[in-house]
């Protein structure tokens, strides 16, 4: 069940859902807007011949912080990591989805590539996967509204929420845009010729 504005406010005011800092003005009819933090991770394309999710690649990204109130310029075709200004904490019976803002999508800004789902039990700043699919650079201002969180009530609390030992949660408590840690639990099924 998708939570309405009144359900979202009740969940936040009771402390079940935490957004820090929380601004009641960000509550929409069925979502909560989130703002862009000031840190970005840019890819160092010259360090590796390719990206390999099976191995650690230190130095694949570099942390960038714009000076003062200066915007970050996202060039056409560029992909960077960023994060929400808000720290988000979900209880064991609420999951969330990050969605982009319509007005920014109409400018060619994609807020996440594929990883918009946030598990129950998660706590941390949500990493954004920003892409510019327009033909012009886009200015990204720290503190601007960058996306929205839709929250869903689970049919029952998760038996093993994010952050539990069973899950091997690699991003619990993350601060700022966190690079991929896929190598920590990379698995691969051997596909043989003639299968199927």
From Swiss-Prot:
GO molecular function ontology, one term from the record: dCTP deaminase (dUMP-forming) activity
Binding-site positions, dCTP: 101-106, 119, 127-129, 148, 162, 174
Subunit structure: Homotrimer.
Record-linked SUPFAM superfamilies: dUTPase-like
Catalytic activity: dCTP + 2 H2O = dUMP + NH4(+) + diphosphate
A UniProt-annotated Pfam family: DCD
PANTHER family, sorted: DCTP DEAMINASE
Provenance organism: Thermobifida fusca (strain YX)
Record protein name field: dCTP deaminase, dUMP-forming
Enzyme Commission identifier(s): 3.5.4.30
